Every structure is written in C-alpha cells, then in structure tokens.
C-alpha cells in the first residue's frame, strides 16, 4: 500500500481528528475540575466571611507555603473564587457553559456583568467563537448582548427564509453595528483615519461575527451588459449563503431596499450555486425610522435586514467633520 494513497491519507486525517477531539475533551475535563475546586474553596471562604480580609490573606499565605509550585492562590484570586461561588451557588453549574471556558474568562464575566442571563450568553459565545479574554472584554464593553441578543431587529427573514435559516440569520444580525475600532486622536487628519481602517479591516470581520469570509468591496456584477457594484460582499460559512451589505451615510430610505433586492437577485443568478442557501442582504444606515423600514421590507421578495451603525460609541464633536464618508470608507477597506 502506498503511503501517499488517498485511503492512507484519509486514515491519517481520521486519527488526527480523534487525537484533537481527545485533547479537547481532556482540556475541558481539567478545566471543569479546576473550576469545581475553585467553587469549593469559594464556598469555604464565604462560610468564614465574618473573619474578615485577614482570613483570606492568611489562607493565601498558607496555601502557597504548602504548595509552593502551585499558582492561582493569590489574595485577589481567592476573592474571585468567593465571588464565583456566590454567582453559581449550585454545583450543577458544571453543566453550564461557564464550566467550559477558562478561569480568566470567568473572572471577566464576574467583573463586568451582574445578570446571570448575560453571563450565560457570553459564555456560550466564547465557546462558539473561540474568543480570547481580550476579545470577550471588547464584546462586553461594546454591548454585544444588547445589540445582538435582545435588540428589536427590522427584517423580513421569517417571511422569506426557512425557519432554521431565518433563526440563524436573526441571531447573526446586530442593531446597531459598532465600528469603534478607529483610533481617534487629537488633530487626526482624514487620511490618518482612512489608514486606520485599512490596518484594522480584520476588526470589521470581528464586528460582523463568526463565519464571515470577505469576497470584495465594490464587487463588480455584469447584468445584461450593464455594470453594477456591490458595496461589500461576503460569504457566511454558518449560513451557507452570500451576504450583500450596502452602506448608506444618511437615514434609511425605501428605495434602498429596492436596490438591494435587485443586487440579491443578481447574486443569486450569477454567483449562487445549487448547494448555497438564498443570499441575504443587510442595509447599514446612519439612522432609520423603524416603521418606514418595516413597510419597505414587507413586500420585498428577497431576505433583507436593516440596521443602524455607529462609528464610535462616544464620538468627540471635534472629530465628527474629519471622518471619511461611508463611500470613502468602503473604497479603502481593502
């Protein structure tokens, strides 16, 4: 048998996948045991809380003395353990997503969130997207839960997509989108901001969410000899469909939906393969009247969502006139 035969290569790949799966299960198991230990220690600390801070300081010193090679038993971390045990009083927390994410991620959830529902939602997103601790902090500070999980979204997805596809598309969508990755500084020139956009294009993909593959800006379509240009074209691997994004500098207008509906028909006709799901459109406007947007989408034949966008969460007035227009922005993304 040849060692480079397809059968052999498939066998090797299968074994590699089994090894990776076992490594993942082992890491999850170790993490779960560590969190159980921290939970137990936290409960013990809480049971002696009347002894005051000196108790934790003494406990930290004695643990380090008994286990000099062990880390994680500083006074600060012991206080986190106590907080962790209070946040999850039942040991059944090991069945929840928080038991599958690293301790450092859990301390972020404890520091920044008070709602159990939000903590659970962000823990699920960490598992789903493989976020680092810093990315988790960024998403919490950007209000992702409010913009994605509980925002009232203007779409016709339910009427134009199968139920499973519609639900996933809604989960993917945000309102508003936050383009806060432009590092604003005093006396910045327009070209400085443009260069920052080019440098940080990967952060645009982070804001859009998992599964987005960038295919181009000002993407050219030839329809019957006429030329058309899509602002931003993506393929979403989770939705298994093309996603057409149109950017508008002002308030939403009904004619924008008609233009995007045409682009989606063209993409479905020219690019979509048999295995692809129907293409989805997203209009990003500086502002929108929700009722006008709802009526505009009601009789559109293609699945479209309308969201607002913000350049920053808190834009200093002196920078407002220096920002490039959305048309300039989309030309310089790549």
Predicted regions and their residues:
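Basic, low-complexity intrinsically disordered segments
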Residues: 1-334
């Amino acid at each position: 048998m040849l060692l480079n035969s397809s059968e052999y290569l498939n066998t090797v790949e299968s074994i590699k996948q089994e090894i990776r799966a076992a490594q993942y299960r082992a890491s999850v198991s170790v993490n779960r045991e560590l969190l159980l230990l921290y939970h137990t220690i936290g409960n013990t600390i809480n049971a002696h809380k009347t002894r005051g801070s000196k108790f934790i300081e003494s406990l930290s010193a004695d643990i380090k003395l008994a286990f000099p090679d062990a880390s994680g038993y500083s006074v600060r971390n012991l206080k986190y353990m106590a907080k962790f045990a209070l946040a999850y009083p039942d040991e059944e927390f090991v069945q929840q997503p928080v038991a599958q994410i690293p301790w450092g991620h859990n301390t972020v959830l404890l520091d920044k969130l008070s709602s159990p529902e939000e903590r659970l939602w962000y823990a699920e997103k960490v598992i789903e997207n493989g976020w680092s601790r810093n990315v988790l902090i960024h998403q919490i500070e950007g209000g992702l839960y409010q913009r994605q999980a509980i925002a009232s979204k203007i779409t016709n997805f339910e009427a134009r997509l199968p139920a499973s596809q519609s639900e996933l598309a809604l989960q993917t969508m945000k309102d508003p989108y936050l383009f806060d990755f432009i590092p604003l500084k005093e006396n910045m020139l327009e070209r400085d901001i443009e260069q920052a956009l080019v440098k940080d294009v990967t952060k645009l993909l982070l804001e859009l969410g998992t599964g987005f593959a960038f295919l181009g800006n000002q993407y050219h379509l030839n329809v019957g000899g006429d030329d058309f240009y899509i602002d931003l074209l993506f393929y979403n691997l989770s939705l298994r469909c093309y996603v057409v994004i149109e950017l508008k500098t002002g308030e939403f207008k009904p004619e924008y939906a008609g233009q995007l509906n045409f682009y989606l028909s063209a993409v479905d006709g020219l690019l979509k393969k048999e295995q692809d799901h129907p293409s989805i459109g997203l209009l990003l406007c500086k502002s929108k009247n929700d009722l006008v947007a709802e009526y505009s989408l009601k009789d559109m034949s293609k699945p479209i969502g309308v969201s607002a966008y913000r350049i920053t969460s808190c834009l200093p007035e002196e920078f407002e006139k220096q920002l490039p227009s959305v048309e300039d922005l989309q030309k310089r993304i790549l």
